[in-house]
């Protein structure tokens, strides 16, 4: 049975989702979780896009030990050399070079002839191969490219040294029958077909990204590209968790097995959702809150008698926790550390002490600590540690029926303390006005969302905010048992990002 490899582009294509803005620390968190998920290749970013992207890609490349780290690059020497500088320290570095091959892209975007495109493919892949052990070439807009020219372009790339050939459905245009046929056509029409691994990359504009990816596997693709939760440009990408579980459950049909640690799916989905602020729909396959819920009386009766009557996926397969109570206020440092290791977290002694202290504070207020609480705790403490400013004091006073006053004290990385107060029509508005006064910002609150992480009156709150000032928009999140504290943390997280970004642009 053939093994299907997964190339995750959450950190590159996924981050292009409108409103998503991840900092370096957040990208590293996701990269480490993707490593635990067993992703074969992770596209860490587009190193030539900006200095920030370059540094993020470089840090991920120097950190990840058990996956290939790849950078995107245009078919330009400067891009390719910049990508090399970013990922050369990786255990397994890879270049991902792309060039459009469809008539519409060649005519209107590239202003290049077919001969020029073929020459550029050959030169860029050849250069890449002189620097990288593995080169992937993508024929952008492949599904709207003339088949004979696509086959010619692919052959040129393989002869130049490309190890992986990606056939992307860049605008989500194709359907499963067409995509399957395209892979079969290339298998028959590319003389050097056997010298490369073929990959698929599907967008969801017509809602067929997962179906098209599975059709590509039927057609001979050995690598599937996509993102966690299907996030990405426009309508998003193929959701890798859906493709992987479909291959596993229906291996009788696809004759293929996903190369992925399926039990890490839920944790990965949750992390990506909380860091990006993109809420997973309740009815989403595999990772939605209702994925394993049964409300119909007939269905409930059937499941109670025999679970397979209405449930084809065991929740534990994808890491859906059935074990609620894990730790409490009497748990010691050793038990806490071992439990965190079990969940896949490793940290230095200083990091452990900080997180354990946060755990003890939470345990004093919360009767039961669940795995979701622990993951949220790690998420919140990581964001807290990465912030330029941290909240040391927060007070809200009732002034009148329509006005409240908030006093906020912040401390920066150098230990400088800033304090101010402001009023607002509610507690949160007053807090946000005070923070704006301290940081000297005049930004607009573009989005505010609150989500309960666990059940019960003592549940942790996760707040996501998006701030906008002029053309700049950033997001931030905060986790705390108190909604006002979580809201303040989220605002400080985002405001610190916005202030840094504005200073960088200036």
From Swiss-Prot:
Residues 4-266 form the Pyruvate carboxyltransferase domain. Its cofactor is Mn(2+). This is 2-isopropylmalate synthase. It is found in: Cytoplasm. Keywords: Amino-acid biosynthesis, Branched-chain amino acid biosynthesis, Cytoplasm, Leucine biosynthesis, Manganese, Metal-binding, Transferase. It comes from the Bacteria. The gene is leuA. InterPro entries: 2-IPM_HCS-like, 2-isopropylmalate_synth_dimer, AIPM/Hcit_synth_CS, Aldolase_TIM, LeuA/HCS_post-cat, LeuA_allosteric_dom_sf, LeuA_bact_synth, PYR_CT.
């Amino acid at each position: 049975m053939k093994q299907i490899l997964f190339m995750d582009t959450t950190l590159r294509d996924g981050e292009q989702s409108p409103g998503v803005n991840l900092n370096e620390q957040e990208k590293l968190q996701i990269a480490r979780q993707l490593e635990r998920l067993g992703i074969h290749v992770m596209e860490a970013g587009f190193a030539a896009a900006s200095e920030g992207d370059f540094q993020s890609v470089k840090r991920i490349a120097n950190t990840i030990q058990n996956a290939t780290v790849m950078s995107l690059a245009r078919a330009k020497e400067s891009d390719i050399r910049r990508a090399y500088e970013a990922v050369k320290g990786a255990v397994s570095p890879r270049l991902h070079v792309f060039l459009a091959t469809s008539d519409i892209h060649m005519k209107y975007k590239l202003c290049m002839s077919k001969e020029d495109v073929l020459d550029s493919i050959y030169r860029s892949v050849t250069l890449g191969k002189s620097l990288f052990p593995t080169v992937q070439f993508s024929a952008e807009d492949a599904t709207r490219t003339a088949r004979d020219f696509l086959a010619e372009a692919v052959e040129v790339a393989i002869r130049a040294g490309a190890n992986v050939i990606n056939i992307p459905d860049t605008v989500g245009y194709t359907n499963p029958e067409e995509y399957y046929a395209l892979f079969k056509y290339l298998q028959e029409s590319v003389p050097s077909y056997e010298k490369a691994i073929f990959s698929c990359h599907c967008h969801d504009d017509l809602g067929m990204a997962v179906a098209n990816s599975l059709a590509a596997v039927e057609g001979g693709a050995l690598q599937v590209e996509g993102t966690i939760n299907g996030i990405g440009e426009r309508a998003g990408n193929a959701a890798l968790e859906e493709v992987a579980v479909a291959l596993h459950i229906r291996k009788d049909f696809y004759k293929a097995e996903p190369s992925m640690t399926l039990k890490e799916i839920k944790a990965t989905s949750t992390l990506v959702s909380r860091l990006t602020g993109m809420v997973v729909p309740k009815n989403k396959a595999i990772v939605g809150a209702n994925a394993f819920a049964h409300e119909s009386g007939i269905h409930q009766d059937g499941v109670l008698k025999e679970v397979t009557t209405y449930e084809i996926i065991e929740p534990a397969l994808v890491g859906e926790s059935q074990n609620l109570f894990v730790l409490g206020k009497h748990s010691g440092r050793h038990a806490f550390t071992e439990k965190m290791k079990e969940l896949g977290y490793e940290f230095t002694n200083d990091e452990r002490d900080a997180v354990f202290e946060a755990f003890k504070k939470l345990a004093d207020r919360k009767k039961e600590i669940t795995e979701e609480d622990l993951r949220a705790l790690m998420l919140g403490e990581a964001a807290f540690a990465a912030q330029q400013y941290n909240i040391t004091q927060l007070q809200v006073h009732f002034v009148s029926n329509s006005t409240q006053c908030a006093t906020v004290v912040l401390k920066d990385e150098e230990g400088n303390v800033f304090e101010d107060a402001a009023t607002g029509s509610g507690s949160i508005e007053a807090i946000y006005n005070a923070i704006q006064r301290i940081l000297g910002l005049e930004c607009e609150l573009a989005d505010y969302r609150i989500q309960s992480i666990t059940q019960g009156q003592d549940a942790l709150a996760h707040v996501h905010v998006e701030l906008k000032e002029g053309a700049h928009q950033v997001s931030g999140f905060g986790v705390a048992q108190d909604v006002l504290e979580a809201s303040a943390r989220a605002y400080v997280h985002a405001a610190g990002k916005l202030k840094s970004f504005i200073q960088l642009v200036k």
